[in-house]
């Protein structure tokens, strides 16, 4: 309680709380941290009693895509990556709300006294935003600038002392977890520690970040790269699932002992007509989907399509859907090891596969929009590749197709998507157009983000699709559109090519790594495609 005492200012016995201040309760919350099984107690304010502030209430949350990009850039530019965790983060910031409370017995001799809450105590609706503003003011004092494409990424131009190379140092903030990328990262953490006290044991090489183990790995080509492994999170999730099935559901449902694939080969969730789940089992199913969606976010690309399919049935799940979710858990129990490596190696791109054409007659003198306020590009340039695919009419009941997208910066997988298309297409040709247009829009946002991070980006993004007709229609100026229903996608993609933002070529279906994100794959094909994305997943087959 010594640390939290500074969050209160005692009201003298002969005075009352100032006019306009609202009385709220405070209570202790006890927990056990699963990372190291330490007991933890935290004093929490009853923020549910107050009105939501008119200003923002969110905390600093850097996007996962930004984290992957930053880790790839760290390896590409040979920079250190160090981590730190702010000690009692929220109470380092001043409180933005007018609230007071009566101190409880945990305050000893001061119990029963009125006190104004002067720090951003956990539980207050404005606590996250207060800490973010407090941290932001210190970042600006250190001459770091918030990235306009991701406000919780801070960057600063630096010079390496050994060769005078200029680059951008980055600080990534995820609530109270700080990741520093710099040629002397510990010195930056030491300076942060002067203003925001960091937990001493947390300062140094990163260990667990966003629920995944973060470590540096030496690849077969001799390159050092950072990788995320969610194995610990996966094992804990499987264990928690087994415990819940036994203690809460009485063993009615079980995790299968063997599951070589996320789904059984004959299973399709959209044709499942089993009985609907009761409210308790429905809540558990929704919880499982939430856990598995986070697994996908931190690197389990191999279950992305199955989790996406089941996510469509959160409002009315059936017994078969829960059994399918448990089958995924059985697969994860068997295949818990995987690593997503952010390899900075430049890919081998044969530009002769991407012939250039004169598009002036069709779209005029168009060019890619370059942000006028982007920082000066520093460091090494990156190459961007995207693979797209679709499964036409994959959903048996709605006839909606599914889009699969993989985006790489150099050889590092940065973004992946498995999602049902919003429209019902009558042909494979149309479904492929919708998928590629979606990918082009994401690429445009990624290129903007890279430029606003100060990453040199001069060439186009290279796009691969496995439908020859669609690729020809997009990449050859004289190709005509036969169906007006595809005109928006048709012109959006072609204009991107005309402005030099993208270049498109054909790739065989067997080599399209986006294929497992459109449909369930099995056997040798699954191992071959996913083995090119995730390390350790199929090592037992090597």
Per-region residue spans from a language model:
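Mobile genetic element proteins and their domesticated derivatives, centered on retroelements
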Residues: 1-2, 28, 70, 85, ...
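Chromodomain-type histone methyl-lysine reader module
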Residues: 1-137, 141-148, 153, 240, ...
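Two-metal-ion RNase H-like nuclease active-site motif
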Residues: 24-30, 82-86, 380-397
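A short, polar/acidic, helix/strand-boundary loop motif
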Residues: 51, 407-434
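C-terminal reverse transcriptase regions that engage the nucleic-acid substrate
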Residues: 69-71, 204-351, 508, 518
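Catalytic palm subdomain of template-directed nucleic-acid polymerases
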Residues: 90-103, 122-127, 156-159, 163-198, ...
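Active-site palm subdomain of RNA-directed nucleic acid polymerases
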Residues: 134-182, 186-191, 195-202, 295-306, ...
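RNase H-like nuclease module associated with reverse transcription
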Residues: 312-316, 383, 422-542
